[in-house]
Amino acid sequence: MGAKGLSGEGYEGHYFWDTEMYVLPVLIFTEPETARKLLDYRYATLPQARDRARILGHMKGALYPWRTINGEEASTYYPLGTAQYHINADISYALSLYLQVTGDVDYLKEKGAEILIETARVWADVGSFAECKGGKYCICDVTGPDEYNVLVDNNFYTNLMARENLRDAVGAVEYLKEHAPEDLKRLEEKLDFSVEELGLWREIIEKMYFPYDEKRQVYPMDDGFMMRKPWDENKIPPEKRAWLYENYHPLFIMRHRMSKQADAILGMYLHNDLFTEEEIRRNYDFYQEVTLHHSSLSTCIFGIVACDIGYLDEAYKYFSQSARMDLDDYHNNFYAGIHAANMAGTWQAIVNGFAGVRCQNGVLKFKPTIPKEWEEYAFRLKFKGALLEVRITKDKAEFTLLEGGEISFTVRGKEVVLKSGETYTCLLYTSPSPRD
């Protein structure tokens, strides 16, 4: 799916990581058959991704292109394109989410495991165990989602997503080894793969390095982020504050401590179960001060994380900006087409943000809230063949199983099991904002 869908000629119809991180999660929960077709596209372009990995010096594995229309890299500026290795982990994340939400083990056997193995192999080759970092595994000269900080060492988002890519690959191989040994043997022969590779993958998972600022108790976006000159927006003329690359030399931009879009915060949204709420709050507070939101992919993510930490007023502000981005033409580029990923991010801001939906370790979770500006909202989700309707009002949350024999999920940690036609109702409790 192109970044503009079929609405305009922006980006020439090219396909980016936006699809896996923003659009696919929506389709996985609403139209899983369509989601599977989008994953099929990535499987179909594995040969080109393998070729790309060889061009970049990796003798094993596959490296997906950052920008493509036919499976080959279409970006000509490698610092903002090819250096975004996180595309591999983004695809792995979307694939793993699909498998958890649908329970489609056949897809894992037929195509999914091959994608996970080939993407993991690149992570096992691109970095090194650095003595200067206490033997931790470091990944240098990459670009994260933030396009104002490029070719950095140990981008937090990249390292986090790479580790989870490796973890998912290990899990897939272990599953095949126990439940589908014939499929594992087929992959071993096809990919010249050995389960002995898992030893290195596990070591990297254990020793992955993450930059950390002890004084502020936050995770910097990369090793050099805290050394850069603070950005003073007040010194920038209003007419030059939009897309900075149009007005300033890249070196000027890269030497300042600011972020174009959600980067580390995006990682904390996707894997919020790996961090405490206080950790997420400290990082949110820090990055809110340095993020310019010059990308359409940013405000929806900050809104979701604001929900996670109880900042509902800020969450609604960010949601409104996302929802009205094309209507009000915030970025002055609607003429080129809609921002499809932002539209999907707006859906996520409601479902994953206000309703607190997550699927982690195969468990569907809810943490419902409601903005004070709304009386109620509702949506439907598909989960392992079941169709669940969720309706949230000022004082309660209702969950009704419309289709499917049975569904289990948790609401603020309490397990709920519904049979077809049944409804579960609970009182809505919204904690006071930590800002109050």
Name each region found by the language model.
Residues 429-436:
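Conserved small/polar residues in nucleotide/adenosyl-binding loops
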Residues 1-7, 33-93, 99, 105-110, ...:
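Helix-terminus loop motifs that line ligand-binding clefts
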Residues 375-404:
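Carbohydrate-binding surface patches
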Residues 122-189:
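Acidic/histidine-rich catalytic neighborhood
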Residues 2-14, 57-81, 136-155, 251, ...:
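Carbohydrate-binding/catalytic loop surfaces
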Residues 29, 98-111, 171-184:
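Inter-helical turn/loop segments and adjacent helix faces that build the functional surface
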Residues 340-368:
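Catalytic cores of secreted or luminal carbohydrate-active enzymes
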Residues 13-45, 110, 167, 174, ...:
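Active-site core of glycosidic bond-cleaving carbohydrate-active enzymes
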